[in-house]
Amino acid sequence: MSRSRINGNFIDKTFSIVANILLRIIPTTSGEKEAFTYYRDGMSAQSEGNYAEALQNYYEATRLEIDPYDRSYILYNIGLIHTSNGEHTKALEYYSRALERNPFLPQAFNNMAVICHYRGEQAIRQGDSEIAEAWSDQAAEYWKQAIALTPGNYIEAHNWLKITGRFE
């Protein structure tokens, strides 16, 4: 049984109903429909904190999805799960892969910046100021890209860039 049929959340049910209607009326291939079904089930599992199940669905969706834009969101969600699991190297990889397909994902740039900033803070605690500076510089570059895509968002990042002298 499709995960969307067993989910008790009203919003998820509403989304599933609308998605099913769209799948019926929009001309798409069976592969695209199947990819979307896996993506939808992945989002449902992810929203419930069932990350292993979500990853299985997302991996299957990436195997089937041919549209780069749609793949970017699947890859982004895989990155979110790896971030939640503390697997930062994998998360950075998936955010990068998402951005290769869709360079207009400010949230991916932001999440990459947050990971780099965190690693910089870790390096400071370990007494390695050179590594900390490199991670902070990388965080700054990612935040600049996120801010450039969505001016007015990421106010805290914007302030951090100013305070640290990294805003140009």
Curated annotation (Swiss-Prot):
It comes from the Eukaryota. It is a peripheral membrane protein. GO terms for biological process: photosynthesis. Pfam families: TPR_1. One of its GO terms (cellular component) is chloroplast thylakoid membrane. TPR repeats lie at residues 35-68, 72-105, 120-153. It is found in: Plastid, Chloroplast thylakoid membrane. Keywords: Chloroplast, Membrane, Photosynthesis, Plastid, Repeat, Thylakoid, TPR repeat. The keyword Thylakoid applies. Essential for the assembly of the photosystem I (PSI) complex. May act as a chaperone-like factor to guide the assembly of the PSI subunits. Belongs to the Ycf3 family. This is Photosystem I assembly protein Ycf3.
